[in-house]
From Swiss-Prot:
It comes from the Bacteria. Binds 1 zinc ion per subunit. Involved in allosteric regulation of aspartate carbamoyltransferase. GO terms for biological process: 'de novo' pyrimidine nucleobase biosynthetic process; pyrimidine nucleotide biosynthetic process. It comes from Aliivibrio salmonicida (strain LFI1238) (Vibrio salmonicida (strain LFI1238)). Belongs to the PyrI family. GO terms for cellular component: aspartate carbamoyltransferase complex. InterPro entries: Asp_carbamoyltransf_reg_N (IPR020545), Asp_carbamoylTrfase_reg (IPR002801), Asp_carbamoyltrfase_reg_C (IPR020542), Asp_carbatrfase_reg_C_sf (IPR036792), Asp_carbatrfase_reg_N_sf (IPR036793). Pfam families: PyrI, PyrI_C. This is Aspartate carbamoyltransferase regulatory chain.
């Protein structure tokens, strides 16, 4: 008798597959790209078993392709995720995740006294990566926050 477990998630014909997202981050990624408001079919796998991560999240978005700009934003949430572009059921392109040097208008500054609160100014952060840790420095109040603090507010 075999003790194999087989996981199946339906393949998509055209679109994007984002795999190896750390567990409990998949929903944040959906909201970041506003995929929760799309009319396209989205397949979500949460807390799936992963030999590398223990557990992971997975997103499959039909007829939608992640841009390089979106991939750099994704790198803040899941720097080791894989992004595959699918055409006719085949992986035609793997999009590398590269941390942006700067990110503007995506996240709120956690500092309630920052000028970005209450003024018509887009937030702007310098991205600092050191020894595997990601920090964001606000352009206006110059406070430095861990990536988790800033992205949890989004």
């Amino acid at each position: 008798m075999s003790n194999k477990t087989e996981l199946r998630v339906e393949a998509i014909k055209n679109g994007t597959v984002i795999d190896h997202i750390p567990a409990n981050i998949g929903v944040k990624v959906l909201k970041l790209f506003q995929m929760d408001k799309t009319a396209e079919r989205v397949t979500i796998g949460l807390n799936l078993p992963s030999s590398a991560l223990g557990s992971k999240d997975l997103l499959k978005i039909e007829n939608t392709f992640v841009t390089p700009e979106q991939a750099s934003k994704l790198a803040l949430y899941a720097p080791h995720a894989t992004v595959n572009q699918i055409e006719n059921y085949e992986v035609v392109k793997k999009i590398p995740l590269i941390l942006p040097k700067q990110i503007t208008g995506v996240f709120e500054c956690p500092n309630s006294n920052c000028i970005t609160h209450g003024e018509p100014v887009d937030s702007s952060f310098k991205v600092i990566a050191k020894k595997g840790n990601i920090h964001l420095k606000c352009k206006y109040c110059e406070k430095v926050y861990s990536q988790e603090v800033v992205t949890d507010l989004h």
